[in-house]
């Protein structure tokens, strides 16, 4: 709908340019937003205020001319001028109802991608191996997964790339520690975190051990068979830990998506050679660097992008450049999204620019750093265990499931007290599992990607507010309508007719699902989908309260309201699935 309104506004602008009202050469970015108060219409634009000055007119006068020039359209009932010159657009109720009937009949709910389909690389999760995933890996994993799901739903070809850290000093530490311990790796490495911490302690305390670790890294990089064999085993064990976390989280990541740093080892020398051939490299204290004039430090000196250390070693930038070239040349990506901590913003700005100057990626390939804030504890400080250690992600998920189980068990006892049929133990365990994992994920996804947030079990497990339990309950509420009806959602007849304010408000929200998903895909911000679903659930609650469904006044009204309920249920379920959340029929 927003695209339609933009096109209508553009046609009006063209007409006003042709008749001399507007000067030639204007190319405004036409903004169309949802109104906050639907009594002021469904959509609004400030285009008249944007162009009033170049037109030499008062905003309201220009708004009047724009309304006069707007072509009629079946989707619009009327356009009004508000305040200093806003254009408020009101959807036609008959057209809106018919569009929802079409959405209900469509397995994709009438959602279409705005623009051509693309091949999109999603760089997500990417933990360092040799130790277990911790809470700091949650955001990249689930935000990247949600955006990937939305892009796929819209028709893009999505290629997930788990750029794990499977090379470097940490493996030298583990190899050196393994030399000192007469143990079997298979037996001892089941708790990789304990083994890693012990190796790190030796590395920090013993200069001799640290030197040995660095020596073993060199041997590993030179292809020493024994080092490679143990390195491979470390990676297998570490990746198996990661996969357990991914499965527990319900994210679409598998071993086939792993493309670690080591995969680009053979390309790094060529990256340096190509940068040299392009005249981009400068030697600085023995290191090979690219200096970009637009990136300077506080003293005004250009900041280096180091691609090879003085000793010959390579850095993250070198590997990232090799990966970008691979993603263009081999994966044929039109767009690459990097879900990495926003503290790496400067790094990505620099390597993106180097990649373009070197010709590793073309000018029209979209490279976007989807930075995110940090997850803190309830006290606002970095999330730690009680003894100050790093919280394993798997431990956090287990605690979430345990807390959710206790919560649903308590609510089950309340069902018994009310004389309702209780859930059995297996059902309670499954509900607790879904509620626990969904709550952790939704609490994160519902925050703006770039914001820091405080992790709080009590808030995220609440059945009130913008939480997973609230939305899961909304889904079960819709499902209960059809259980009472004794009929499936796919068997509905009749058509949608919009009469009551609550019906219109719910319908208007449902009609925006496609625009909303396209916005999430464009900006990489799942919190918009969370906010949409939360508002949809609230509007359904108001509709449910004020518009009797099963006891409607006549069969036509009953059919219409059942169809609205069915479309609401499907939209809630589809939206939650795109966020990577499970749903429940009963809870």
From Swiss-Prot:
Record keywords: Aminoacyl-tRNA synthetase, ATP-binding, Cytoplasm, Ligase, Nucleotide-binding, Protein biosynthesis
Motif, 'HIGH' region: chain positions: 127-137
GO biological process per UniProt: arginyl-tRNA aminoacylation
Pfam families, sorted: Arg_tRNA_synt_N (PF03485), DALR_1 (PF05746), tRNA-synt_1d (PF00750)
An example molecular function term from Gene Ontology annotations: ATP binding
Localization terms from the record: Cytoplasm
Reactions accelerated catalytically: tRNA(Arg) + L-arginine + ATP = L-arginyl-tRNA(Arg) + AMP + diphosphate
GO CC entries: cytoplasm
InterPro entries: aa-tRNA-synth_I_CS, Arg-tRNA-ligase, Arg-tRNA-synth_N, Arg-tRNA-synth_N_sf, ArgRS_core, DALR_anticod-bd, Rossmann-like_a/b/a_fold, tRNAsynth_Ia_anticodon-bd
Record-listed E.C. numbers: 6.1.1.19
Annotated NCBIfam families: argS
Record text on subunit structure and interactions: Monomer.
Family to which the UniProt record says this protein belongs: Belongs to the class-I aminoacyl-tRNA synthetase family.
Protein name per UniProt: Arginine--tRNA ligase
Native source organism of the sequence: Pseudomonas paraeruginosa (strain DSM 24068 / PA7) (Pseudomonas aeruginosa (strain PA7))
